[in-house]
From Swiss-Prot:
HAMAP family: PEPCK_ATP (MF_00453). Mn(2+) binds at residues 204, 223, 260. Its cofactor is Mn(2+). Involved in the gluconeogenesis. Catalyzes the conversion of oxaloacetate (OAA) to phosphoenolpyruvate (PEP) through direct phosphoryl transfer between the nucleoside triphosphate and OAA. Its main location: cytoplasm. This is Phosphoenolpyruvate carboxykinase (ATP). It is found in: Cytoplasm. One of its GO terms (biological process) is gluconeogenesis. It catalyses: oxaloacetate + ATP = phosphoenolpyruvate + ADP + CO2.
């Protein structure tokens, strides 16, 4: 590839620069004995390198801001929580701070990659980082250009400057949340990061940008995993972190398209990424063989306990965080589609980890209830995926990905509903959380439920109406434990379920008020208290 003139970014051309290094070169750099602090990588007995991201073991959404200017003023969803505005002055100050940090580096890594498998909609993204394992992370997670594509890469569509070693000393006077920052400038098409080492800020940053650009073109942008069967039947799994997107889409009977971020255009479903980013807390070979086997050379583990002999301890009791992760190139999964795209989706599955044991393991949705539950995006926030979350709490996340939405939720709902109607797709709400036994629904039962959705046997099953929640559930399904499909049966006292269900229904109803009066036609498709 042609040498990049760093001076246009304010970075000295005298710094040693490594362009799109090989996995072998990244491996050597990560385990270099001269590495200090969180730059250090540890070789594990699997061949994968493990790193520690410090105190930032998850994203920091409260430190995420977007420059408010003529381009973004009337397009960004300025909700004051997810998308918070900053001035151009603050941006300029913190970009200077980031560039100064990068100018102190002995060596920089430049990774030119693609975000999106479709040539006409993909973003060319340039990552400029000073930590070898961060270069490894984006090499795993984004689409790796061929040598020919690198030679003809040209100018990037977006540039990410990662200054994780610096912090913002002026954050209080600037009215920001803390000394760390994750900022976006859609006019300059740049992201800057300071103070946090967590690699997921780069991954989710570019997802947020695709969530801005693609729906404006009529393309659905989705926080989901996706796979495809032998007959070309595509299933999409929406869900927040920890609900099972990665685990359930890695199905040995089907081919993986991707595990987290996808678009849906006139040609079908396509992946934004070139890798997977799986949670590994309490990982077992029996329950998640594909992820287990993907942890080998070129995979990158985060915050996993490594014993003195190099063996890994995935157990919750041994881990510093519940958000232990591994990134790996998608070709570490045996059954994949390359390039990572397929036809139009037929099955839309909304995953929820209900911590309160109220939702059924599976509910069959119609067109309106599908839109209702997509806009609500109910789950329970699970420990570790964000700073400050240590216990499960009920959460409503529009589009099952509120933290990454840059446009109003209804824009995503409208585009998805249009695609589903055009291609006769059906939707289901699947609870991967808990029931009245205070135990989590087993992965074996959930997989059997997914099988019933895919093979459509769920459509033939007799349905039961669940009051209050206003949902229809199958009476029985092959391979699913008896007595769990109706959540009321998991309680020794049905009155306890009813009390919890009314409490959750009230939360649904209160949450949906934000979509009124426009969404009034959907109210009858949600939970009811009268």
């Amino acid at each position: 590839m042609a040498k990049v003139d760093l001076s246009k970014y304010g970075i000295s051309n005298n710094i040693i620069v490594v362009y799109n290094p090989s996995y072998e070169d990244l491996y050597k750099a990560e385990i270099n004995s001269e590495n200090k602090g969180f730059e250090k990588g540890i070789v594990t007995n699997t061949g994968a390198v493990s790193v520690d991201t410090g105190k930032f073991t998850g994203r920091s959404p409260k430190d995420r801001y977007i420059v408010k200017d003529q381009i973004t003023e009337n397009t960004i969803w300025w909700d004051g929580n997810i998308n918070k505005p900053i001035s151009r002055t603050i941006w300029d100050n913190l970009k200077d701070l980031t560039i100064k940090q990068l100018n102190t580096a002995k060596k920089l890594y430049i990774i030119d990659a693609f975000c999106g498998t479709n040539n006409d909609t993909r973003m060319k993204v340039r990552f400029i980082v000073e930590v070898a394992w961060q270069a490894h992370f984006v090499t795993n997670m984004f689409i790796r250009p061929s040598n020919y594509e690198l030679d003809h890469y040209g100018d990037p569509d977006f540039v990410v400057f990662n200054g994780s070693k610096t912090t913002n000393p002026k954050w209080k006077e600037q009215g920001l949340n803390s000394e760390i920052y994750i900022l976006f400038n859609l006019t300059e098409k740049e992201q800057i990061i300071g103070g946090t080492w967590y690699g997921g800020e780069m991954k989710k940053g570019m997802f947020s940008m695709q969530n801005y650009y693609l729906p404006l073109k009529g393309i659905a942008s989705m926080h989901c995993s996706a796979n495809v069967g032998e007959k070309g039947d595509v299933a999409v799994f929406f869900g927040l972190s920890g609900t099972g997107k990665t685990t359930l889409s890695a199905d040995p009977k089907r081919y993986l398209i991707g595990d987290d971020e996808h678009g849906w255009d006139d040609n079908g479903i396509f992946n934004y990424e070139g890798g997977c980013y799986a949670k590994v807390i309490d990982l077992s070979q029996k329950n998640e063989p594909d992820i287990w086997n993907a942890i080998r050379r070129d995979a990158l583990l985060e915050n996993v306990t490594v014993k003195a002999d190099g063996t890994l301890d995935y157990s919750k009791v041994a881990s510093k965080t519940e958000n232990t992760r591994v990134s790996y190139p998608i070709h570490h999964i045996n059954k994949i589609v390359l390039p990572s795209r397929a036809g139009h989706a037929k099955k839309i599955i909304y995953l929820s980890a209900d911590a309160f044991g109220v939702l059924p393991p599976v509910s069959v949705l119609d067109e309106k209830s599908s839109q209702y539950h997509f806009l609500c995006g109910y789950t329970s926030k699970l420990a570790g995926t964000e700073r400050g979350i240590t216990e499960p709490i009920p959460s409503f996340s529009p589009a099952f990905g509120e933290a990454f939405l840059t446009l109003h939720p209804t824009q995503y709902a409208n585009v998805l509903a249009k695609k589903m109607k055009e291609h006769n797709a059906t939707a289901y709400l699947v609870n991967t959380g808990w029931n009245g036994t205070n135990k989590r629904i087993s992965i074996q039962d959930t997989r059997a439920i997914i099988d019933a959705i895919i093979d459509e046997s769920i459509e033939k099953a007799e349905k039961i109406y669940i009051p209050i929640l206003n949902l229809y559930v199958p009476k029985s399904l092959s391979g699913v434990s008896k007595g769990i499909l109706d959540p009321r049966d998991t309680y020794t006292n049905r009155g306890e379920w009813e009390e919890k269900a009314k409490s959750l229904a009230a939360k649904y109803i209160k949450n949906f008020e934000q979509y009124l009066p426009e969404g009034e036609y959907l109210i009858s498709s949600g939970p009811q208290l009268s």
